[in-house]
């Protein structure tokens, strides 16, 4: 899949999809190129234990309701560093949808998996739902992951695709359910720049997205 340069702005989350957010990336490829923008990172830990991603730090337990099924296809790598990126990238995405469903733009779980600047971007995306009293329902597959590591393996680019064809938003007050407008490409490519913090957690530094980018 060809991946051209994408604009790195918080508005990308709000404008590329009428519906949902995910990312597009990472299976097994690595690169010697440095990953721009994914340097040292920081985050605030949550209180509970969590899925293992290759370190001893306690990660938050992310809980999603049965009304929203977020599935990850082929989310494995034989490289342990790439697998750690995949694991934390997966939980970062799950934490974002948890924040939307719980109507919580200040989500500590999401903040755990973001740098400070990354969390500001995440909050803008989350508020595109919470400010409109929207939650998410349905099924959202996440697939075609790809990880590219920097030379020192302290930064990475995680890309992946999502298919929004069976996912919808629901208004918390009226109950109105909406999917994407007719004719909208349901697949969205996401590219997440990530950095490894002092605790060994891979955090999102910034995100880029392109609707229809998965077919390129």
Language model features: what each stretch is:
Residues 105-216:
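Structured, amphipathic secondary-structure segments that form assembly/contact surfaces
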């Amino acid at each position: 899949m060809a991946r051209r340069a994408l604009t790195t702005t918080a508005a990308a989350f709000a404008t590329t999809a009428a519906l949902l957010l995910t990312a597009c990336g990472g299976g097994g490829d690595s690169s010697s190129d440095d990953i721009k923008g994914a340097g040292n990172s920081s985050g605030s830990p949550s209180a509970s234990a969590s899925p293992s991603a290759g370190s001893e730090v306690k990660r938050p337990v992310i809980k999603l309701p049965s009304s929203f099924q977020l599935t990850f296809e082929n989310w494995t790598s034989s490289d342990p560093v790439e697998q750690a990126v995949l694991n934390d990238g997966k939980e970062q995405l799950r934490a974002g949808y948890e924040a939307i469903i719980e109507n919580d733009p200040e989500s500590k779980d999401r903040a755990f998996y973001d740098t400070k600047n990354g969390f500001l971007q995440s909050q803008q995306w989350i508020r595109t739902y919470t400010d409109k009293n929207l939650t998410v329902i349905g099924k959202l597959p996440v697939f075609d992951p790809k990880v590219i590591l920097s030379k020192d393996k302290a930064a990475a680019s995680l890309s992946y695709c999502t298919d929004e064809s069976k996912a919808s938003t629901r208004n918390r007050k009226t109950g109105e359910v909406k999917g994407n407008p007719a004719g909208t490409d349901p697949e969205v490519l996401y590219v997440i720049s990530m950095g490894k913090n002092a605790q060994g957690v891979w955090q999102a530094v910034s995100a880029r997205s392109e609707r229809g980018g998965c077919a390129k």
